[in-house]
Amino acid sequence: MRDRLAMSDREQVPDRDSSTGAVASGSVDTRRLRVALLSYRSKVHSGGQGVYIRHLSRELAALGHDVEVISGPPYPELDPGPRLTRLPSLDLYREPDPFRIPHWREFRSAIDILEFAMMCTASFPEPLTFSLRSWRVLVNRPRESWPDIVHDNQTLGYGMLLTRKAGLPVVATVHHPIAVDRRLELAAATLRKQIPIRRWYSFLRMQGRVARRLPAVLTVSQSSRADIITSFEVQADRMTVVPLGVAHDVFVPPSQPRVPGRIVATASADVPLKGLVPLLEATASLRADRPVELVVVGTVREGGATAAAIERLGLTASVRFVADLSEADLVALFQSAQVAVVPSLYEGFSLPAVEVMACATPLVATTAGALPEVVGPDGEAALHVPPGDPAALAAAIGRVLDDDGLAGRLGAAGRARVLQRYTWRVVAERTAAWYHACLAEGGVTC
């Protein structure tokens, strides 16, 4: 493998700024690589990671690389180019019967038994069990068919270290450290509920250990880079930043008028981190003097804080949750909004932010995490508000609803920012350059 990637056969590999992890421009190695792209769950509707897998795999293949996506369920929706290898699991969290008890005939291996046992103790087993399944599949192949590089998408299970020990180069993308999600959920939970939350997030210790032992880690923003260095104690010189992209030829400005008073937000999960309760309180405030409708892409958790806030604020008729939208329906929804909101208490990047900007939809976003880095300075392509501040949210949303000129300027600037910075082809080119740089440095299997 190393012979195929000898220094004498490659062009100049771009340098990396050790202080920021940014990849510098310059001539890059364009030779074809065999890439195994791993993700323990990858369906587009499961969140931003499914979107990442779909578009990165397609664009890497378009650049001429041989791309195999290895995924557990729910499986990704791939475009022509990459191929999919499905790794079946017990799929214990599938809808409509999450936390199900599988039939004994479903158990096919010791990994299945481990998966079920971990669920029974309120732990989340998928990162560990998927990593073990992928290790088993990869190392049992003939060595001549091994990929040149294994790119893990935030699984960070112990199986990744076993894969490296077998001699395969392994690197990873970490979108943001899930320790942030755990901290926010614990802060919002009662003492009784904190115990199962801690058990559920017990995989974080494993993820930190694995991340520290990988020679190269990719992330999507400078904010996430700083958080990963702090939370996972990854060495700064092992970190590289490549921002995410958007399908800018699909997410386009509308050809029809927007729906007056329609506010759109996206929440991949009904958890405190997504800031839905402050947004609901802002919506209730806005309804006092104007007709507004809030449409949230996601699902509401029965008996949770969001459902309780909707009832408490009398918003049952004014708030709508929509889930499992096709890409075309999602685009149409973003195009229909008079204003879009990202109310999160933390974001490592925020794909919805760049998707709505690509639709030239005016955006209000909090200053949490990477959001200012992604959407740009306050007032240019988006209005900034402090996280968790319903009054500030209501004021900013109201400004956009009341000022067509401001809305138009924000929308046009958002679209321009996307076209300049956030395309999937650029993401793939920079990721491929990172692969070559990692392999050239010679430390990917140490």
Where are the regions that the model predicts?
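Acceptor-binding helix/loop patch of EC 2.4 sugar-transfer enzymes
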Residues: 98-122, 164-208
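Carbohydrate-associated surface elements
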Residues: 223, 245
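Conserved donor-binding/catalytic core segment of Leloir-type glycosyltransferases
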Residues: 255-283, 295
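Nucleotide-activated donor-binding/catalytic signature segment of Leloir-type glycosyltransferases, i.e.
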Residues: 306-328
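Short alpha-helical donor nucleotide-sugar binding micro-motif in glycosyltransferases
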Residues: 324, 332-337
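Aromatic "clamp/platform" in nucleotide-sugar-dependent glycosyltransferases that forms part
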Residues: 345
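Short hydrophobic beta-strand element within catalytic cores of glycosyltransferases
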Residues: 362-365
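Conserved acidic donor-binding segment of nucleotide-sugar-dependent glycosyltransferases
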Residues: 377-378, 382-390, 399-404
